[in-house]
A protein has these predicted regions:
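Alpha-helical scaffold segments in soluble metabolic enzymes
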Residues: 2-10, 65-69, 79, 83, ...
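Glycine-rich phosphate-binding loop of actin/hexokinase-like ATP-binding domains
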Residues: 1-72
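Conserved active-site and cofactor/substrate-binding residues in soluble primary-metabolism enzymes
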Residues: 2, 29, 60-64, 75, ...
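A mobile "lid/hinge" subdomain adjacent to the ATP/sugar-phosphate binding pocket shared
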Residues: 73-118
């Protein structure tokens, strides 16, 4: 909610009417849909394994993969889950080359086809979730990139941008060169604003703690003296 709130302020929007998609893209990653100030969906499920392709996590898979690999490879369910968590994602798709997106971009630019494939699959999955959440909210006003990859990897942002142009946003190539700074990436003709919003988890925790202290009650209804 921190990033969506900052995106709304940066874009000069009314939080009661804004529809925001937050792409938290790091070694772990998720996409969230925030409608009128309330989170309505997120790509992660019971565990972080659901959703996007990540550094070492597979993201969405047919649950039958567990029984399939158990029978085919003689693996236990725990071993399959371990592979999905620690040996999959872009690491697996790049044939073990790297889970670091900087390495993958560099390798892709020098002709490593597996690294290129891993990045393309990653961007496709992010683009698919953005489209799904735009549909879920019946529109989107802002798409915000955040976290290590989202804030700093211009190449990955550009690849994702190729999948979301139909929404009415066009990422400006020059603006997209900026790394680690709050900036609007989309050009003036875009109907949907695409931006980078640096995350600040410490500030978010501090703000929430201050609000709880001021209210004298926490999220679960527990009260305490101010």
């Amino acid at each position: 909610m921190f990033v969506s709130g900052e995106a709304i302020k940066f874009g000069g929007l009314d939080p009661k009417n804004a529809k925001v998609i937050v792409c938290h893209l790091g070694n772990g990653a998720s996409v969230s849909a925030v409608k009128y100030g309330e989170s309505v969906d997120t790509s992660m499920g019971l565990t972080p394994l659901e959703g996007l392709i990540m550094g070492t996590r597979s993201g969405d898979l047919d649950p039958a993969i567990i029984s399939f690999l158990a029978e085919k490879e003689g693996m236990t369910a725990s071993q399959v889950i371990d592979v999905c968590n620690k040996k999959s994602g872009v690491l697996g798709l790049s044939d073990g080359y790297s889970s670091d997106f900087r390495d993958l971009v560099q390798a892709s630019e020098t002709g490593n086809e597996q690294a290129k494939h891993a990045l393309e699959a990653y961007a496709y999955r992010v683009g698919k979730y953005i489209g799904a959440y735009a549909a879920a909210m019946n529109g989107v006003d802002v798409i915000a990139f955040t976290a290590g990859v989202g804030e700093n990897n211009a190449e990955v942002r550009a690849m994702i941008g190729e999948y979301i142009g139909y929404l009415g946003t066009n990422i400006d190539a020059e603006r997209n060169k900026v790394r680690g700074e709050e900036i609007i990436l989309s050009d003036e003709g875009s109907k949907v604003v695409t931006m980078v919003v640096p995350t600040n988890e410490e500030l978010a925790i501090a703000r929430k703690s201050a609000a709880i202290a001021e209210a004298g009650t926490d999220t679960y209804g527990n009260t305490f003296a101010k």
